[in-house]
Amino acid sequence: MGKKDKRWVLQRKNDHYYNLAKKRNYRSRATYKLFQLNEKFNLIKERNVVVDLGCAPGGWLQAARDIVGDKGFIVGIDLQTVKPLPYENVIAIKGDMTKEEILKQARDLLPEKPDVIICDASPNISGVWDVDHARSLELTTMALMTATKMLKRGGNFVVKVFQGDLFEKYVQLVSEYFDKAFTTKPRASRDESAEVYVIGKRFNGRKFDLNSKSPIVKLLDLKPVEEEITSPSLRKEISKEDSGLMIKRIKEMRSKKE
């Protein structure tokens, strides 16, 4: 075992929330993040209907089930297979949250439109700050888009985002679809982690605007880099820093697509 592996094992052994989760048979220390977020923002209530995007390994499914009780209902969606939980009112679907057929499958299972959509998903980490921030924004924007398709009016949303140049613009984007937007870092988050949680309270019912002028939405556009650089309208909308990040992300997405 290398030095790095030994440090990781030691850190985990000394991790209060890891040990607490293990003791109480929760699948992840992240379970306590949702408990703490809910304690502070009152996102999920007893009997609520909840959708968990990127639900593997199931820690947030467990936390949500503890909150909604046996009268609520929870559907999780993840690209990975999630081991079933021993509750009739918790179901995990294997699939892509951006695909309409997967969302239809989720809707067919739900007794009504969800009261809350939660997302603790993380992108594949590269270790490069700008790239990880951009990947996080892509994932969280997809989660927001899904939330606007599924949530009932007045519903709540919580999503994990990595900090970076466009973080505040993502918060602004969330505020377009919710009466209030907040940011927070629960106690269970590690101090060294770049993760922050964005909260949207009381969904206003607006459909997601694919033509939004937000630079966050522009990140999802796969037009050639040259078009992005020379577009006068785009140049007016974003700063140099945003543009640099955008171009990096487009290049990365294009190479991945190829």
UniProtKB/Swiss-Prot annotation:
Keyword match Methyltransferase: yes
EC number of the protein: 2.1.1.166
**Which organism does this record belong to?**
Methanococcus maripaludis (strain C6 / ATCC BAA-1332)
Report what the protein is called.
Ribosomal RNA large subunit methyltransferase E
| Active site positions, chain numbering | K160
Grouped into one coarse class, the protein's main location is cytoplasm
GO molecular function terms noted in the UniProt entry: rRNA (uridine-2'-O-)-methyltransferase activity
Which reaction does this chain catalyze?
Answer: uridine(2552) in 23S rRNA + S-adenosyl-L-methionine = 2'-O-methyluridine(2552) in 23S rRNA + S-adenosyl-L-homocysteine + H(+)
> Where in the cell does this protein reside?
Cytoplasm
Q: What does the similarity note say?
A: Belongs to the class I-like SAM-binding methyltransferase superfamily. RNA methyltransferase RlmE family.
Function comment: Specifically methylates the uridine in position 2552 of 23S rRNA at the 2'-O position of the ribose in the fully assembled 50S ribosomal subunit.
Q: Which residues bind S-adenosyl-L-methionine?
A: G58, W60, D78, D96, D120
Could you list the residue ranges that cross the membrane?
Answer: none
